[in-house]
Amino acid sequence: MGTTSYWAEPNSERREGEPKMDDFTATSQTRNEIFQLTEKLHFFKGKLRTSDDNGRMGWKSLTFAEGPVRNEIDYTSSKNRSIKRLTLLFERIATTMEYGWKLSGLRADDPSALAAELKQMQRQVTRRQLAEFEAIAPIVRAIAFDSRIPEASRRYARELLKETQSQREERASSTAPYFSAHELLPYEATSRRSE
């Protein structure tokens, strides 16, 4: 249990790029948070009232699927605290996964651009704007110890690993969620239970 799939499709209006998918093992804290919120939202059964029914904010979808049960809600924005918390968590996971894909590409094609990307990631980690960093830790670790990568990039990667390890230890000793709700960005996310 704990296998999670992150799937991203290109911008629906421009249809640029290819769909991407990655599987990773979500932390127990994240799994628990997602399923507690999903349960509070009745496993996404029924209709959800949104603050912006004309779609100016960008549509979001949440899906719960287990066996023959498949529930989905679509919304633009919501004042519901559980929806906000779940949206924020999925946004942070999405940002983390996108960084992983970008770092992999830069490592292969443009190692000199890694330093700027890693520095930006460091700022987001410090502000706790990423979630499930463990999913992309292997690529960051590979950068940190790859002698073909410029030293500045390797140093940023090592610092990033150290900071995320510190935050992981801090979260492990706390039962509180590691994020707080604030302004949300458009996204698409799927919550799916895996056995």
Label each residue range with its predicted role:
Residues 24, 28, 80-83:
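Generic detection of long, well-ordered alpha-helical segments
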Residues 1, 29, 57-59:
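Extracytoplasmic
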Residues 1-4, 67-69:
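Short, solvent-exposed coil/turn segments at beta-strand boundaries
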Residues 27-51:
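Charged, amphipathic alpha-helical segments
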Residues 47-195:
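Short, well-ordered, aromatic-rich surface patches in folded extracellular/luminal domains
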Residues 2-22, 119-123, 137-141:
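Acidic/histidine-rich, surface-exposed loop or edge segments in extracytoplasmic proteins
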Residues 25-33, 64-70:
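A short, structured loop/turn motif at beta-sheet edges
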Residues 20-25, 74:
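A short, exposed loop/beta-hairpin motif centered on an aromatic-Gly-Thr core
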